[in-house]
């Protein structure tokens, strides 16, 4: 089975328990872990459910990432390729959040 087939299968089959957990997670964690936006959020599995099926409904396996405008879901969660995954997504999101929070702001004098 190819990686893209696994991804398609995991997306194509709706799971009522997953949808309930997803909604609860996004209600409790309503900001992107990387940029703090409240818009276009996704509950991302830290460990992919294709290989860690037992973690599909585990709340500790979720992190909130945005899909727009920065798309940290693709950038940090999947390293720019939805066939990939980032085992360091939690740590990477913290690093990016600090970088964004502490970035220098250009000011006109």
How would you label these PLM feature ranges?
Residues 1-21, 36-40, 83-109:
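A boundary/linker detector
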Residues 10, 14-15, 58, 68-69:
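Polar helix-capping/helix-linker motif
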Residues 16-44, 66-68:
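Short cysteine-rich loop/turn motifs with clustered Cys
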Residues 47-62:
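Short linker/helix segments within small regulatory modules
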